[in-house]
Amino acid sequence: MRSATHATLALFPLNTVLFPGGPLRLRIFEPRYLDMVSRCMREDSGFGVALIVAGREAGGAAQTVAIGTLARIVDFEQLDDGLLGITARGERRFRIVHVHQESDGLNVAQVEWLDDELRAEVPPQHAVLAELLRRALEQIGPAYGEVTPAYEDATWVGMRLAEILPLAPIERQELLELRDGPERLHWLQSRLDIQESRDDDSDD
């Protein structure tokens, strides 16, 4: 069931936060998720990723936050241990309206799509963050495949930094839920300024 504003998605609760445009690598071994992946590849559809707030990734049920991200499979392989490995990429954000559990334990959600953020350039006061990201991605390597970097785009820079900086999952979730690129950069700049202040104090 799909409309311009709503859809039905299989949910994959995880202890991580997926951002639009971000990479996600998973090892798939539970039957419910093997079936989900098979269906997604057969129908060229995606699945929903949402941060767990109660429960576990493997086995049983898990409760999640309300805001998640659509993931679309872009590659798959058989891993050395024989399990299925998939690479997915985040697309658009959604808000969970209702969840039910199917007989195989798979959570299926009715979701409402969230609007994409309006494009905004990185404000001059946050240009240092774009440069920080550039240097970090040079160290990390091709984590984003053939995606062309957009160091002038406030949303792209903020989301990529939110993925690679050492933040708690709930902090990443807070950044995912922000709807404004420059506001996300302000959050990150404030956090980095606080950390630098603590580091300076520890050196005294």
Task: State the predicted function of each range.
Residues 1-204:
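N-terminal low-complexity, acidic/polar interaction/targeting segments
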